[in-house]
Amino acid sequence: MPEQAQQGEQSVKRRRVTRACDECRKKKVKCDGQQPCIHCTVYSYECTYKKPTKRTQNSGNSGVLTLGNVTTGPSSSTVVAAAASNPNKLLSNIKTERAILPGASTIPASNNPSKPRKYKTKSTRLQSKIDRYKQIFDEVFPQLPDIDNLDIPVFLQIFHNFKRDSQSFLDDTVKEYTLIVNDSSSPIQPVLSSNSKNSTPDEFLPNMKSDSNSASSNREQDSVDTYSNIPVGREIKIILPPKAIALQFVKSTWEHCCVLLRFYHRPSFIRQLDELYETDPNNYTSKQMQFLPLCYAAIAVGALFSKSIVSNDSSREKFLQDEGYKYFIAARKLIDITNARDLNSIQAILMLIIFLQCSARLSTCYTYIGVAMRSALRAGFHRKLSPNSGFSPIEIEMRKRLFYTIYKLDVYINAMLGLPRSISPDDFDQTLPLDLSDENITEVAYLPENQHSVLSSTGISNEHTKLFLILNEIISELYPIKKTSNIISHETVTSLELKLRNWLDSLPKELIPNAENIDPEYERANRLLHLSFLHVQIILYRPFIHYLSRNMNAENVDPLCYRRARNSIAVARTVIKLAKEMVSNNLLTGSYWYACYTIFYSVAGLLFYIHEAQLPDKDSAREYYDILKDAETGRSVLIQLKDSSMAASRTYNLLNQIFEKLNSKTIQLTALHSSPSNESAFLVTNNSSALKPHLGDSLQPPVFFSSQDTKNSFSLAKSEESTNDYAMANYLNNTPISENPLNEAQQQDQVSQGTTNMSNERDPNNFLSIDIRLDNNGQSNILDATDDVFIRNDGDIPTNSAFDFSSSKSNASNNSNPDTINNNYNNVSGKNNNNNNITNNSNNNHNNNNNDNNNNNNNNNNNNNNNNNSGNSSNNNNNNNNNKNNNDFGIKIDNNSPSYEGFPQLQIPLSQDNLNIEDKEEMSPNIEIKNEQNMTDSNDILGVFDQLDAQLFGKYLPLNYPSE
């Protein structure tokens, strides 16, 4: 036991330092022998070991291996980099050094064997290097055999074949390792070169890369264990960029990234930045050291937003990204996020959050937002200060700005991830910041008289804050984590729509969406705020999008729900149009992560419509192709953005997977509806029963809507101040959602006269009324119930929407061709549901009508065998067209089959090997759709969009699908 205790005491003793660095030797102070040493770290000296020791200078024995002649071995980062960039070299090094090792002998430490030296032998150093190479090789290629049993030529040949795919992963690994580990062993050295202040951006960018590569040096480490003992928390050595470059990056942060997030005071920031550059780094005060991480973080974000989506200089773009990561790590190492109390520290955390968002690192971003929120709450930023609080005007306004910025980021990131918000509006009473420019807020007073009613950047941020307060309500009302029921009240949604309407009407003229002649100073803010508004609308209408599914039973569909589902598609199309405009005007880059998300979900929503659409007439087909074109436009926008940021790239890759999974269905639908003028294309199935409501049936509310809520929604829909009067989707659009079924000449006449009494000419029994809104340009926005549903035009017989049961009743009783369809939806209480199947007046009333449908589909619609109407193929086409035109959705709902999250399973006919697609005008080729493929495709579609919900709204949010 005493011997073990003595050995333990010896093991914890500090290792004797064999050599001090040049600076410590010069100043004759204790050195810890590290690279860099603690003394050089504290005083920002350059830590070198260049000067030879006196022992080396005086020694005449060339056989002694002294420290002055020790060759620096490779650091771990160097070895990892070598493994990733050139595995040939890694393998050859291991083989070569193992070949040398057996013949290596110990170098004599002295001519006198009685005084052995304790220096390393060449054999030991080689073994250490081999062990380190082998450790990395085993980690990079864990499934390969031992290096001695590896056929290196074969392996290298295979590696080169797959190099393109594997290189990206290895490069990313090396890059991340270099940023986190290698830089952490270097000290902070914010030293300005003699010509830094006069450097220009063009002169600086080419040279900065080489400076950063040579910023740190490495010493030989005895072994992997010795290397792991190096302090990881050591700060990073970074040379501040020239002032011109720093100002350029900071300006990019303010004017591109933080347009809607205002949490800084520009004059104060510039003043502290000037002091930083004018002060010797050795003489930095504690206040300047507190400002340094904020400066680094602002530069890091500015580097990301300096990347251009149109630049062809890949090396410059990669350099900017690397610079962003470098300064981000510098800021992160300098700040203690667990003890951030001052304004500069919390601002720095906010900048780090923005950087993480733009880099698509949402998990870390979520953690940092929580830290920032707790720091702000601990500092009392959420409480309103009294006039005699003792804080200066700048401090008071900064507290407001910081709190509301953190609050907005918290609401946004939790909406993205489907997680609870950190704070409720009932928990704070802080007022919004004053709408004053920074120059009009000083340390001693406010200067509102100098504002002259000019909209400030803080005023822009305030409008964004008001919008996010509404977003918070939407999430609370429509996406509660703890639900009391599955009921969504129409009144609740209507009140949220009206709040958005009031917010929109209260915007200053510079921020009104689609306003013309906008001052260039406000153009970017206008477009970004418009995009945020559309993003809020997407979340508002998202619970209704499943009403566009062909699996929905028409008799249980609430028209107001369907209308809002259509609004979600209209909003998505507006997002695509706006994003395309912003990209073309260089107002949007891939670093706007929330913009990429909004575009992504918009395209995904359009894809859902494309694969669930019913096209009963030419107008619907024309709209279908417009939406298909918009979806492809949105995808092309993401392609332009994906190379400018990691966030955009990840978003595009996820969307591309959806495109690939749904590609087969797109091909089928495109072939089916290849021409907007094709009115006779139809799909023959044995389940083509007309899902029209029975003449005596009344509209039944969906399962998750209460009867009282439905009544309220209907009464609201009829009134002038209803939600129909306010269509958020069309409020910003200059074009209708789809073609209006009314006579075009009548529409043009009424629009030209500026009348709004079109709803008075409608059937009073129709639930939805028409609105015409004239915008500032004199253009009309026509809003109709039939804008939000599919329109069917059966020749001279006008029919209204699928939910206008009065018109359906008239159409059913006055059908001009009674031989066409004689089963007017026989689903009456007490009757067999199988009677709903169309048999085309066949005498076969058996429950299984597969034979009839087989005959209908046989020989290109020559269904004369079981059809009492012995007309020619043209009559058969007319019959099938009328069958389709009187079919609300054309798909039977099977409530007993499995479903995806409440979506009823699509019942596919099993009696036919394929489904023939006929085209009267031969505008599209005939294709065959296998039943099994169609079944699988339907499952894939619903499964993909269920995954999409999980990706975008988190697993904690309800999908709000109707339960059967």
Curated annotation (Swiss-Prot):
Regions recorded as binding DNA: 21-47
Main subcellular location of this protein, as a coarse class: nucleus
GO cellular component: nucleus
Modified residues (Phosphoserine): S166, S186, S963
Entry keyword Protein biosynthesis: no
SUPFAM superfamilies named in the record: Zn2/Cys6 DNA-binding domain
Composition bias type Low complexity, residue spans: 800-896
Region (Disordered): 104-125, 190-225, 733-764, 800-900
Gene3D superfamilies: Zn(2)-C6 fungal-type DNA-binding domain (4.10.240.10)
Similarity comment text for this entry: Belongs to the ASG1 family.
Additional record remark: Present with 396 molecules/cell in log phase SD medium.
Name of the protein described by the UniProt record: Activator of stress genes 1
Protein's organism: Saccharomyces cerevisiae (strain ATCC 204508 / S288c)
Taxonomic lineage: Eukaryota, Fungi, Dikarya, Ascomycota, Saccharomycotina
Originating gene: ASG1
